[in-house]
Amino acid sequence: MAKSYPLVAAACAAALAASRAASADTAAETGDSPALQEVVVTANRREESVLTVPYNISAISAQQIEEAGLKDLQSLTRMVPGLVSADLGPRVNSTNSNLIIRGLNASDQGSNYFGPNLAVPLVSTYIDDVPLFVNYNLTDIERVEVLRGPQGTLYGSGAVGGTVKLIRHKPDLGLFSVDVTSDVSGTDHSSGASYSFEGIINIPLGETVALRANAGYSEQKGFINGLHAAEFDKNGQPVLADPTNPLTSDYLYHQINDVDGSNNKYGRLSLLWKPGNSFSLLVDYTHERDHSGGFSWQDVAFNYQTGATRDRPLYTTTQRIPQQPLDRTLDIGAITASVDVGFATLTSSSSYYDNRYNDVIDLSSTEQYYITRNPYYYGGYPRYAAFNFDYSTDKSLVEELRLVSKAGRPWDYIAGAFYQDRRSLLSDPETLPGFAAWSHLPGSANNYNYYAGTAFNT
């Protein structure tokens, strides 16, 4: 049903007109006219005005990031037209790129849900010159550039839909500065407050060298409650509801609140050496650790035999293992050297990253499906609470060499070479706690044998 608010619209129009009139009067009195700040981007691997870039591009400055309260790549969708993402919570967002530009993505959102997806996405992400997807904190970021449409020429594979570039602040040779920020927030249906804090320091070390460092910590409280969590002892074995009946007893269950909470620790060191206008060397190291709990989902009670569903309280899950932790450790090292050769700028960018994951995924619903259809699946084991122990590594060595012409020349050009050696591994063994011990429990059997015989000898 459409609604109109003519009085509000008229008031807004009047206020806007008054504001414009006041601005015009002020400009006439002072003789000053408002000036628009030029936006400089590096989409073409050179610094140039965003107005001269022949691409559909959006650039978001550090001030805009701060004013809008943007925290990570998922939140960029609030400011960038055409950039879409399915926010599946920190458990999924930290491992997989759900970014979509112009409707292009490597696969549907659901297929990326449970664990790391090592396939190359159709929207590439760069941290400075490092081609890597992580849901990076938008802290100490100078600018975010979003390029729409195919960018394979300059940004290689994974850029069919577009490219998202995070350009971080570099050390400042002429300024000593310290910046400390913190914030506290609340989430509906959560039992606690979320918070974060960060410190940034820039230290000139003489006239040609500067060091920049930042570190921070954030904690996001969950809002999903696990109503039916199975208990395990310190050895990972089931705690029985009836210890006197190990053959048929179910788990002992309890409730866990806010299972989908997460925290993030990160730090970065950056050293710049610039002995003159014709040469610069930047050395950068980043370390980051994430911990995420369960999934931010509301499950539906489902009967596998009849297909019927039952209502359950909102913001709850009945998974037997609702706490499905994911731990991620990221290390990025990069060395960038640039030299002015007169007619162009020659740049060498060398980088290495090591992205590691460990996580647990509850498969109890899958086992329930088979056990419901066949009571003797797993030999009739009564305590089905299976899960995967996932382990994933993603390592890459990248070298890029490029020659970029000077701006303002009649003929602009860029030439370069790119090499990447990427190695990925994913292992996901499944375990069923307590099954081995249960299948070797002592049992008893009664055997009866009756026989009789006769013989006739002659």
Task: List PLM regions with ranges.
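Transmembrane beta-barrel wall of Gram-negative outer-membrane proteins
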Residues: H189-G293, D331, T393-E399, V404-Q420
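Solvent-exposed loop segments that connect transmembrane elements
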Residues: F223-D258, G293-I321, D362-F389, P429-T458
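Face-selective signature of the C-terminal outer-membrane beta-barrel domain
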Residues: R328-Y357, A386-T458
